């Protein structure tokens, strides 16, 4: 990028439109928050429009970062369809002023109805994909009705949507409503994404899948890894393991339970993202057990991390970029993860990461036993090497430069 282009990108006004923002949501929302923060700290003017929650101000400002919180923006159980109908926001004076201010509009989640509005105002749009929504209506590209990664190109199986919603605790009416909406409108969402000037994927694995299903995006689809949060190493005080994926079968909770039945020696798993009053405690015949916690604030996560030396990531879907993996390595933990999605890219070269084929619970059980038998000194040494390798490969300054290049392309 030449000096003039660099100065132009440096002075850009960037508008993020996202239904949720960290600390709400999951990995995609964390990535959006980190991007907004990173760009603001490097001198760009950044505005974010998101949903409001109790005790949060309607507007907050810190340096170059300004956040506007609108009521009930993401109140629907099916957020992507709720947002499609928010014409009261899209056609408001408030929104027109934001678009007039912006040089570039970024869509990091499901607010795709804003894409044609921004284009009508002559604003370039960057869509940031954290799942597979353009090629899969439930964004996972995993068919739970057949228990395998979906291979249905350009089609949508109602049985897949039904299985997905049931697995995530939806009742009959919610399941039928989701099936109807997803089957009827997901092709419309594809068309909206195609209007984007650039599409950013967060791993090579994700980009390859998206392009294979939508060749029309090939020339505008870029790979930029997510920025990393600033996390310090946490001292290891215990011999337990952690699982932070909640009850979702896509995150591999069923695989973990199956594996623990084959673990010969006792192991304790700290599992977050559950309703403790409903889940209680699972005790296995070998005296291994799972202790359940609800979704916790970062300070309480750190307390749990002190009791663990290894984080388990047994996902069965092709997760594009695993923040659980990244945070575990940055905080000085070993990782046992399935070889699926973008995770193998993340952990490449890390000596303290142990991988198994997705769904292979017997191999997972063997790895749990192997790691649990390692000495504390060996665990700490491997964890330190993990962090060193990881930080050399993933650098926030580098990913910022890569995003600047995309901003320069769409800004012309």
For each feature predicted by the language model, list its residue ranges:
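Carbohydrate-associated surface elements
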Residues: 205, 227
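Nucleotide-activated donor-binding/catalytic signature segment of Leloir-type glycosyltransferases, i.e.
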Residues: 280-302
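A charged, aromatic-enriched C-terminal amphipathic alpha-helix characteristic of glycosyltransferases
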Residues: 27, 380-407
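Glycosyltransferase donor-sugar binding loop
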Residues: 244-247, 268-281, 294
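Membrane-proximal helix-turn-helix segments that form the acceptor-binding/catalytic region
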Residues: 96, 145-199
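Conserved acidic donor-binding segment of nucleotide-sugar-dependent glycosyltransferases
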Residues: 349-362, 370-376
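Conserved donor-binding/catalytic core segment of Leloir-type glycosyltransferases
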Residues: 200, 228, 233-251, 257-261
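Short hydrophobic beta-strand element within catalytic cores of glycosyltransferases
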Residues: 310, 334-337
């Amino acid at each position: 990028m030449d000096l003039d282009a660099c100065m132009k990108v440096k002075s850009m006004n960037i508008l993020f439109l996202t239904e949720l923002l960290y600390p709400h949501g999951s990995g995609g929302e964390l990535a959006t928050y980190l991007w907004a923060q990173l760009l603001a700290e490097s001198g760009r003017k950044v505005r974010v429009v998101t949903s409001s929650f109790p005790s949060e101000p309607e507007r907050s400002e810190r340096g170059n970062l300004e956040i506007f919180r609108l009521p009930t923006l993401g109140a629907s159980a099916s957020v992507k369809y709720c947002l499609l109908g928010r014409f009261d926001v899209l056609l408001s004076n408030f929104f027109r002023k934001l678009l007039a201010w912006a040089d570039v509009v970024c869509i990091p989640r499901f607010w795709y109805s804003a894409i044609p509005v921004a284009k009508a105002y002559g604003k370039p749009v960057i869509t940031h994909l954290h799942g597979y929504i353009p090629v899969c209506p439930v964004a996972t590209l995993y068919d739970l009705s057949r228990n395998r990664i979906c291979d249905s190109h350009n089609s949508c199986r109602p049985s897949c949507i039904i299985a997905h919603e049931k697995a995530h605790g939806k009742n009959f009416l919610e399941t039928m409503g989701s099936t109807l909406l997803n089957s009827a409108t997901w092709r419309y969402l594809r068309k909206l994404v195609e209007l984007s000037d650039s599409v950013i994927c967060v791993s090579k694995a994700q980009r390859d899948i998206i392009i294979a299903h939508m060749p029309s995006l090939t020339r505008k689809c870029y790979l930029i890894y997510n920025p990393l949060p600033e996390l310090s190493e946490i001292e290891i005080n215990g011999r337990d393991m952690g699982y932070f994926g909640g009850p979702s079968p896509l995150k591999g909770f069923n695989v973990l339970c199956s594996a623990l039945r084959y673990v010969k020696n006792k192991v304790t798993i700290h599992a977050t993202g559950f309703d403790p009053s409903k889940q209680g405690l699972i005790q296995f015949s070998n005296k291994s057990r799972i202790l359940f916690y609800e979704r916790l604030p970062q300070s309480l996560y750190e307390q749990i991390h002190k009791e663990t030396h290894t984080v388990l990531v047994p996902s069965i879907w092709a997760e594009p970029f695993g923040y659980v993996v990244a945070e575990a390595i940055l905080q000085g933990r070993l990782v046992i993860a399935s070889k699926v999605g973008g995770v193998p890219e993340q952990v490449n070269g890390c000596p303290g990461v142990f991988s198994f084929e997705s769904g292979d619970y017997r191999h997972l059980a063997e790895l749990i036993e192997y790691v649990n038998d390692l000495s504390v000194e060996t665990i700490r040494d491997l964890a330190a090497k993990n962090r060193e390798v990881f930080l050399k490969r993933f650098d926030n300054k580098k990913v910022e430069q890569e995003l600047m290049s995309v901003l320069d392309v769409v800004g012309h």
